[in-house]
Structure formats: C-alpha cells, structure tokens
Amino acid sequence: MRTLLVLCALVLAGCAGVPPTPVAPADLGLPRRVHITLQSPGEVRQDALLVVQAEGAHATRWSLFDPLGMPQARQILQDGQWRNDGFMRPNGQASDMFSAILFAWTPVSALPSAYPGDDWRDTATPDGGRERVMNELCGPRWRVTWRRGAPADTFTITTGGGATWRVEPLKDTP
C-alpha cells in the first residue's frame, strides 16, 4: 500500500512539474507587447498586458501588468530557467503561462530543436485552423489553437486544468 501511495505521488508530481522551456533559442521578434484575457473555471475574466524583451544574449524579460499598470509578475528566462526579476513574489502560474506563450511563439520549423522529443505536436484542424499541443505524463499541458484565417500572433491557450489564455497583439494607437 505504501509503495502504491509513493507511486501515485510521483505521478502527480510529474503532472504539476516545472513548465517546459525550449532548449534551443528561436527568433521571437522581440520586443513584443500583447493583451491577454485570462479565464479560469469558476472565476471572473481578467485582462492583462504582457511585455517581453531581450535581456542580454541568452535571456528574455517577461513583465505582466494589470489594466492599471500594476506589475503582477516579472520574470527572466535564462538558460531554460525562470527566475524572479526584482522583489515580486514567486508566481508559478505566470511561469506556466509565459512558457505556454513561448511554446506558441516558437516557429514550427524551430520546434524540433527547441523542444526535442515527442511531447508536442502541431497539426491542422478540420476547420482550417491550427492546433499545437504540449503533452505531459497526465495528458495535454497546453493546447494552443489558431482560428482559420487568424494572424499567427492571435491564439488561445487552454491548460490541462481548464484555464484559457487568449493572446493578441496590442493595437498601436496614436
């Protein structure tokens, strides 16, 4: 019985592990500014602004703000590891969301080198859109969908837990 409990704990730990990050960099066209609509089951929809910029040769800075401009998360991805930037408290949900957006932004041609192995797939959907899935031991971690005819930088990410993150570029207005 004890062995079974330990085995179950290990399986569950694998399902809630550190989000995957690319092992090889891809050209992301930085800096980027996007609007994110976050919706978790049973919670009120939230809007956020994400700014991503290069930080030296091998790092990117990810800054998430609420609609009033208050920082919600600031993290740096360097050598495949997330770390906090400044005095913000750790935010695991932000790391997961940032990793999912990075997965979506990675060009199809760069996926095999950035995410080696067979944990992901990128396919056309029957309605003419596109879908990209990152799997983990317990099923899909993220499902990225692009509607038919939608720009490549406008997509929706659905997590294994049912949360959705709608990502679209900020409109440049004078």
Regions found by a protein language model. Name each.
Residues 20-29:
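Short, low-complexity, disordered segments immediately C-terminal to signal peptides
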Residues 1-7:
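Sec-dependent signal peptide recognition
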Residues 16-20, 36-43, 49-51, 70, ...:
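Mature, soluble, non-transmembrane domains
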